[in-house]
Regions:
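Conserved N-terminal Rossmann-fold NAD(P)-binding element of oxidoreductases
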Residues: 18-19, 127, 190-191
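Short glycine-rich anion-binding loops that position phosphate/pyrophosphate groups of nucleotides
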Residues: 23, 130-133, 200, 290-292
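Rossmann-like dinucleotide-binding core of oxidoreductases
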Residues: 177-238, 245, 256-258, 343-360, ...
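FAD-binding core/adjacent interface of flavoenzyme oxidoreductases
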Residues: 2-12, 84-186, 285
Length: 444
């Protein structure tokens, strides 16, 4: 038995995972069903939210094409089924000497305390708190833009998008002369990485759905969507061929693609560029760049980089503490011989969860830890319901229906990691059956 003995009371090794995103939740599930089930370790997952939704789906939540309440996963229920514990809380400090993390209280909208401030003991800590948007200090970005870092922000955008659309619809109905007016709604998305590109395509799809549901006074052509990128092409981390293919598809949809445009400042209705140009914008989304949360900077004396990410060794242990690991977007790992860190992508978090399941077993048994090796399986970008572009293992470029099927399969693989093949098959069947009965767009 691998339990530690304190007096006559046995205590198993306590693994605390902070952050229930794609990587953290998959790791907790794997460890719960291996170490937790066999009582070798006590596995605890901590998150500031009660539910999980796969982050790459947030652009669909924001557009209303995905109802977040139907695809969310409750942490308490999932923990109960998978042999780990879930604590509601938000970490703000680590006490390395006492091996405690400190949680701040969680307060409801009505001012009531949902979770008190407290400390949680750990033997091994895994930090998996993900990332937040990086506004680079741009004037007006925090106050005027919506970010898409979590479900609540995506839900907020969806409500504002729907409200803006309905208000414009009402104005047209009140004043017939407004029917000739173009660009009644101006949406600006700052940042043409994966999130920005996917959101732009999904919003244009949503505009067509509004018309199908009878809101015909505002045609899709009257909704101007501008995708703004500071570099010379969209999707700059992908190949030029994939970038060009995605741009052509976006332009076919009627989306304005603005490249080499650096945002200087943002106010309530206008975005100003450094070259003196400006564009109107009723609704603004900031999707340019990421960083780890600010509180992580130099936390507990650990090494962090300029993006607040915890610097880790090839074992994913932090550089200054063997008992603290980091994974996903909040970790910076530069493989030997590489010039830059591995990218902040869902497939990285998935591979790290698989790696850490074994590595943490070795860690508990005080064995030599393996080295994490990232295997890039390619990237896929969704261009709404029926199209995707990207490249797969070996650099093969794909697009169209085949790419779309592969894109959807990424989410299904995440579900398999959490629920297993049988339950995922049931979820797929449920989604197929409900497609014929539920609206294709959230209208509330």
């Amino acid at each position: 038995m691998n339990a530690k003995i304190y007096g006559n009371i046995p205590r198993s090794h306590r693994i605390v995972i902070v952050g229930g995103g794609a990587g953290g939740l998959e790791l907790a599930t794997r460890l719960g069903n291996s170490l937790g089930k066999r009582k070798i370790a006590e596995v605890i997952l901590i998150d500031a939210s009660l539910t999980h939704i796969w982050k790459p789906l947030l652009h669909e939540v924001a557009s209303g094409t995905l109802n977040s309440s139907e695809d969310e996963l409750n942490y308490f229920a999932h923990a109960n089924k998978n042999n780990f514990e879930f604590f509601l809380g938000k970490m703000f400090e680590i006490d390395r000497h006492k091996k405690n993390i400190l949680l701040e209280e969680i307060i409801a909208d009505d001012g009531q305390i949902l979770a008190p401030s407290r400390s949680i003991r750990f033997d091994t800590l895994v930090v998996a708190i993900g990332s937040t948007s990086n506004d680079f200090g741009t004037q007006g970005a925090k106050d005027q833009c919506i970010f898409l870092d979590c479900r609540s922000q995506a839900d907020k955008f969806q409500k504002e998008f729907l409200s803006l659309y309905l208000k414009a619809q009402a104005q047209v109905l009140l004043d017939e002369s407004n029917k000739a007016k173009q660009d009644d709604i101006n949406i600006a998305i700052i940042g043409a990485g994966a999130t920005g590109v996917e959101l732009a395509a999904e919003l244009k799809h949503a505009a067509h759905q509004f018309c199908k549901y009878g809101l015909k006074s505002i045609q899709p052509k009257n909704i101007s969507i501008s995708l703004i990128e500071a570099s010379s092409r969209i999707l700059p981390v992908l190949s030029e061929k994939v970038s060009n293919s995605a741009e052509n598809e976006l332009k076919k949809m009627g989306i304005n693609v603005l490249k080499n445009c650096r945002v200087k400042r943002i106010d309530h209705e206008v975005i100003y560029f450094e070259d003196g140009r400006k564009i109107p914008a009723n609704l603004k989304v900031w999707a340019a760049g990421i960083k780890a949360p600010d509180f992580l900077k130099d936390i507990a004396g650990l090494e962090t980089n300029h993006l607040n990410q915890l610097v880790v060794r090839p074992t994913l242990q932090t550089t200054y503490d063997d008992y603290i690991f980091a994974m996903g977007d909040c970790a910076c790992y530069i493989p030997e011989g590489a010039s830059r860190a591995i990218p902040p992508r869902a497939q990285v978090a998935n591979q790290q969860a698989i790696f850490l399941e074994k590595a943490l077993k070795d860690h508990i048994e005080k064995k030599t830890l393996p080295i994490f090796i990232f295997k890039d399986k390619g990237s896929l970008i969704s261009l709404s319901e029926h199209n995707s572009v990207g490249h797969i293992l070996g650099g093969v470029n794909i697009e169209g229906y085949i790419a779309r099927l592969m894109y959807v399969s990424l989410y299904r693989l995440h579900q398999v990691a959490l629920h297993g093949m049988f339950k995922t098959s049931i979820l797929i069947l449920k989604d197929l059956l409900s497609k014929s009965s539920r609206p294709h767009l959230k209208m509330h």
